[in-house]
């Protein structure tokens, strides 16, 4: 009699939780039925109704896993924690031409990571990011990515600001437009913010200065304009800052030198001006610095280059720079591999000490007003080959050993 009561008790518990019975019978941790149905429906919205999850993947968190779906145990039951849609692998979930964000996707309330890669591509069926229900994922979602979706149009939903646990927001290579919502600056846990390769306009929000945990900020290849806010100096944890290929103007704020941990600073292809007034020497963690194609101007020799020991890549071409090429570059930048100073207004002699930089493998100084004679060794010219260029300096003399190297290469 006692065993009979136990049997009915177990059956009632299984019924209450709506479990997948096949899993329970095998002694495997079960999945809540509503969770499984929500997963199947959410995927169908992207890949099509032909996709019959219950037949193809009856145990999506167990012995019939779905490519792009990961699960984890919570209180003894399986829940979906990662959902990746798009052709990352041969057997990945691929989007149909006409996709839909079904409400069931937002019922996966243990979801930590959600990504869409090369999914929204149809010319005839443009897609916008839903502006509703994201708050249902606020307690779990840590990573959200829309990558390489050319027909993903519209604006960044302001409701994203409710995703307080978000650590990574990547909206890269899409067709998104409009201004970046200032409310994104309220996502205090963000460590990576990548909005590159869209058509965003307007200014960078001042509120971004609140993102003190941010490690990577990439807003490159948009149409952002206006001034770079001084609050950028508040991103004290930042390692990489890429604002290249925008329409930004004005002086680079001195506060940017507060970013002591920065290893990459890329401001190429904007319209920054106002001279080299940033104390770059204080940014002694920099490994890559690219300021080219900005009418910044200023004297190249005013920077204490000898203090920038970790620089590997330095591109200061097309910047209207004046003055001489300082010997302090050779004295301090022992790790430097790439140096481009071409198409400026630099004058004076080119110091042979530049040859003493042990790692340098590319040096470009064409298009300046350099004078005197090049005094590098044959070995230096052989080492750099075509990666050395000093053309279009009208008063610069080229020694015979350099001419022979050029004639040999041109053959």
Residue ranges and their predicted role:
Residues 1-411:
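Plant-biased, solvent-exposed loop and capping regions
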């Amino acid at each position: 009699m006692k065993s009979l009561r136990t049997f009915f008790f177990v059956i009632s518990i299984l019924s209450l939780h709506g479990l997948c019975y096949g899993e329970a019978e095998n002694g495997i941790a079960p999945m809540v039925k509503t969770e499984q149905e929500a997963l199947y429906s959410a995927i169908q919205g992207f890949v099509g109704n032909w996709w019959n999850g219950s037949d193809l993947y009856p145990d999506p968190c167990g012995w019939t896993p779905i490519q792009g779906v990961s699960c984890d145990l919570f209180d003894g039951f399986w829940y979906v924690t990662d959902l990746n849609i798009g052709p990352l692998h041969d057997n990945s979930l691929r989007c149909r031409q006409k996709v839909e964000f079904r409400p069931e996707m937002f019922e996966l309330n243990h979801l930590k990571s959600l990504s869409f890669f090369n999914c929204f591509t149809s010319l005839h069926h443009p897609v916008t990011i839903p502006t509703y229900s994201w708050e249902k994922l606020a307690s779990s979602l840590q990573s959200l990515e829309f990558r390489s979706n050319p027909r993903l149009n519209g604006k960044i939903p302001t409701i994203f600001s409710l995703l307080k646990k978000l650590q990574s927001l990547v909206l890269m290579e899409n067709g998104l437009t409009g201004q970046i919502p200032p409310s994104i600056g309220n996502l205090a846990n963000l460590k990576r913010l990548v909005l590159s390769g869209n058509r965003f306009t307007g200014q960078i929000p001042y509120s971004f200065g609140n993102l003190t945990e941010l490690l990577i900020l990439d807003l490159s290849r948009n149409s952002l304009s206006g001034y770079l806010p001084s609050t950028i100096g508040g991103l004290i944890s930042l390692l990489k800052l890429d604002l290249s290929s925008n329409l930004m103007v004005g002086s680079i704020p001195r506060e940017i030198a507060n970013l002591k941990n920065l290893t990459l600073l890329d401001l190429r292809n904007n319209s920054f001006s106002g001279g080299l007034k940033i104390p770059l020497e204080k940014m002694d963690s920099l490994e890559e610095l690219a300021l080219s194609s900005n009418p910044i101007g200023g004297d190249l020799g005013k920077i204490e280059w000898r203090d920038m020991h970790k620089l590997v890549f330095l591109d200061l071409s097309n910047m209207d720079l004046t003055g001489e090429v300082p010997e302090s570059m050779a004295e301090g930048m022992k790790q430097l591999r790439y140096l481009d100073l071409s198409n400026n207004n630099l004058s004076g002699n080119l110091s042979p000490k530049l040859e003493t930089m042990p790692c340098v493998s590319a040096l470009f100084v064409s298009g300046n007003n350099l004078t005197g004679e090049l005094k590098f060794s044959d070995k230096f010219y052989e080492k750099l080959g075509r990666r050395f260029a000093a053309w279009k300096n009208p008063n610069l003399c080229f020694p015979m050993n350099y001419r022979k190297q050029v004639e040999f290469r041109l053959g």
